Amino acid sequence: MINYQSIKPWLFKLEPEDAHMLAEAALRIPNVCQVAFNPFLESHFITNSILKQELFGRTFFNPIGLGAGFDKNATMIRAMQILGFGFTEIGTITPKAQAGNPKPRMFRHIEEQSIQNAMGFNNEGLLSAQKRLKKRFPFTTPIGINIGKNKLTPDTQAINDYTTLIKALHELGDYLVINISSPNTPGLRDLQNEEFITKLFEESKAITSKPILLKIAPDMSKEDAVALTKLAVLKGADGIIATNTTVDYSLVKEPKSIGGLSGAVLKEKSFEIFEAVAKELYGKTTLISVGGISSAKEVYRRIKAGASLVQIYSGLIYEGPDLIKNINNELTELIKADGYTNITQAIGADRK
């Protein structure tokens, strides 16, 4: 197996989006010859019972998931299991295919181990995602589907985009995620308000009993984050994902003027919002933490703060395909060291 750190300098000479497309091409190979990757699956997909838990009616063999935005079109689901992820969140999917924002729209901040992206929900649309999901359904590991509105859809009609997606996709995933927190679709974050949240969840829960989660932005006060998430849960949200990328450009030395920051610079900002939400909602709903996570120590910090699951994206780019295996092995030891026999005992330990 090729050592990732030896090829990373070469990959990083490519434009970030070109490198991603190259990685996607490689990660689509298991779709046609999965058996060739069985040795990698056996070594990287950790099945230690200490990490196993039941959520959303499914078994999660470990708590590490792929964050939305990496597999936009449901082309790499099999590969993510081979890399060791306990679950995968695809998307963001919009009703109609859209090209996203003009290029260049993805940038590396290598010194800060971070990514800045202004992709703009580029994806092949609902019909394409639906076709791929149907072809591979049911899935060995849980699948989340992240959904968003089209750029040209007026805010007054945004709910129609979300309900259209829910109707078409709810039977093809294990949970759905309402994305109104990306900074790359004009006006999208303005939908993080009481009126829209109330109507959205009322209509969505009338369509399906499948879990529907809300993903929030980090660029709001703790008080606003708590108020928004409490309202969402009251209106029917089955979980909260905190957080999306940040537009706090002071976190990097040479920021671009567009897009959201992810990776190491987001770690503390995302944790602060997550912790504030967890203090109010731990034990009342399922909490998923994402933002700047790239080590077992940080995963365990989020778990003890109240996260049942965590998600990783930028860390995978900087650390490579062994990251998830290494985290799960180290996380197992951290849980054991605290005297627990299962991850569920550690979840929310700091809230008890």
From Swiss-Prot:
Bilayer disposition of the protein: Peripheral membrane protein
Requisite cofactors: FMN
Top-level EC class as recorded in UniProt: oxidoreductase
SUPFAM superfamilies assigned to the protein according to its UniProt record, in alphabetical order: FMN-linked oxidoreductases
Positions in coiled-coil regions: none
Binding residues for FMN: A68, G69, F70, D71, K72, T92, N146, N179, K215, T243, G263, G292, Y313, S314
Keyword tRNA-binding part of the UniProt annotation: no
Binding residues for substrate: K72, N117, A118, M119, G120, F121, N179, N184, N244, T245
GO MF annotation: an example: dihydroorotate dehydrogenase (quinone) activity
Record-linked Pfam families: DHO_dh
Subcellular location: Cell membrane
Co-factor binding comment: Binds 1 FMN per subunit.
Any Gene Ontology CC annotation: plasma membrane
Reactions listed under catalytic activity: (S)-dihydroorotate + a quinone = orotate + a quinol
Superkingdom in the source lineage: Bacteria
Main location: membrane
Keywords of this entry: Cell membrane, Flavoprotein, FMN, Membrane, Oxidoreductase, Pyrimidine biosynthesis
GO biological process: 'de novo' pyrimidine nucleobase biosynthetic process; 'de novo' UMP biosynthetic process
Family matches, as Gene3D superfamilies: Aldolase class I (3.20.20.70)
Active site: S182
Entry-linked NCBIfam families: PRK05286.1-2, PRK05286.2-2, PRK05286.2-5, pyrD_sub2
Stored HAMAP family: DHO_dh_type2
Biological role stated in the UniProt entry: Catalyzes the conversion of dihydroorotate to orotate with quinone as electron acceptor.
Protein's recorded name: Dihydroorotate dehydrogenase (quinone)
UniProt organism field: Sulfurimonas denitrificans (strain ATCC 33889 / DSM 1251)
Name of the gene this protein is made from: pyrD
